[in-house]
Amino acid sequence: MEEDNLDLEGMDIHSGLDSSFHSPPHTSDPAGLSMDETDDIDDLINNVRPHDPLGTLEEKEADIKELTHSWVTERMSPTLLPTKEALLFRILKRVQLQIEVIEEKSIDMSPDTDVKLELLIVETELERIKYLIRSYLRVRLLKIDNSMEYYQSSPLDRMNMSQTERMYLNRHYALLKNLYAHQFMNTFPDSLKQMNDSSGSASMVQEPNMDHPVFVRVVKDTGRKIIIGNDSVKLRKGSIVVIKYSIIVKYVESGDVVFI
């Protein structure tokens, strides 16, 4: 996304997102709202929705579903998955549009209008979206922190990072090396100063645990069997399986199964 020149690192996620990111109406609402009440809330939100050149309402809702799916998948996967930088770019651009509209309506607000209620509903919905973005980014940064040496020595895995995440990795790694050197490593023999030494019985490079157990749901009835030792598991559509990530990863990548 370098051509769009969006500084994801400097974006203030606390500012909120586009009010169009709301769940579509359901016939049975868990909060006990009727269809008419849900439609009324949608109408209020529409009044605060700015003109958005980045997509239709359906496309915006699809972006939120994709973000939710990406967050769940990232949490379940022990490895760093390809970044959703383009998705975050679209959502964060809508943040800027929504901020302008909210500020304008807050300034022009009069006690005889329903603007206060409109803004309250929009801000409540924005909190949910902000939570998804923060959680998604925190999960990715946690993986980078836990396996810093591994990602530093793995150019292929670094391709899954955004430019901002690669900058974070390089800066954090440099700070950590400098701290260790000044605190204790300068007193060690040269043969013991390497932070990525894997010559001994225990490697200093902490790699992602590919045998981490994961929950998956089969979404395509392929009829394939997975052999695990003397046992086998058949991938039937709708079935839920707990299995090692290393065994199921190729089916996740092909879209036959999804994390839950």
Curated annotation (Swiss-Prot):
Residues 17-26 have a biased composition (Polar residues). InterPro entries: GINS_A, GINS_bundle-like_dom_sf, GINS_Sld5, SLD5_C, Sld5_GINS_A. It comes from Yarrowia lipolytica (strain CLIB 122 / E 150). Signal peptide: none annotated. Residues 1-10 have a biased composition (Acidic residues). The GINS complex plays an essential role in the initiation of DNA replication. Has a role in chromosome segregation. Disulfide bonds: none annotated. Component of the GINS complex which is a heterotetramer of SLD5, PSF1, PSF2 and PSF3. Residues 1-33 are annotated as: Disordered. Pfam families: Sld5, SLD5_C. Belongs to the GINS4/SLD5 family. Its main location: nucleus. Gene3D superfamilies: 1.20.58.1030, 3.40.5.60. This is DNA replication complex GINS protein SLD5. One of its GO terms (cellular component) is GINS complex. One of its GO terms (biological process) is double-strand break repair via break-induced replication. It is found in: Nucleus. Keywords: Chromosome partition, DNA replication, Nucleus. It comes from the Eukaryota.
